[in-house]
Amino acid sequence: MRALRALRPTARQRRASSSFPRLEVAPRAVDGSRAARRLRAAGLSPGVVYGGEAARPRRLVAVCEKALGRELRARRAAVENTVYELNIQGEAGTELVVPRQVQLRAATSDVLSANFLRFSPDLVLRVPLRFVDAGLNQTLRRGAYLHRVRHALGVRCADAASVPEALEVSCAAGGKGHVYHGTDVALPPGVRLATPAHAALALAVVKTK
């Protein structure tokens, strides 16, 4: 229980220098299902920090299940394109990571395990698409609807601060049968497409009587 309390960020840590949300984790030395069960019994979820430069080692960690569960519920689909400042107890400095392979218990949605991929400019992030300006499109206003082909798009970001929460696609133009492509996405500075620019995102469909 003492270790569990220590993994919960203090008020000072929440006000830390970074603008990124912060996660506290503890190093762990033992892997395997028996060790994972012991961690879960203590309110912790096992995880791995990996990726980044080739020379950087894979790290075994444990994270407070309740703290990570709150993040998952608050951010939902956007959690895997949210950059976190990860503090490993007993080590100087922090790492910028994104959650990956989050496994939930089916009955309760408790976090069974979660891995953390180190951020790099080469990392492909799947960012949710947000279709806007439908009210300015005459075809859509007259009863047509958008048939979405993709709900997210792969992008690379120059730095962690430029990772967007969502990508906007304007639907102001386009009539019946119009296809919106990756080229219609408004990319923020420092963000470039990893998905082909010609990839179809949505289709304007007129309802049949």
Model region roles, listed by residue range:
Residues 2-209:
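Extended basic (Lys/Arg/His-rich) segments that typically form rRNA-contacting surfaces
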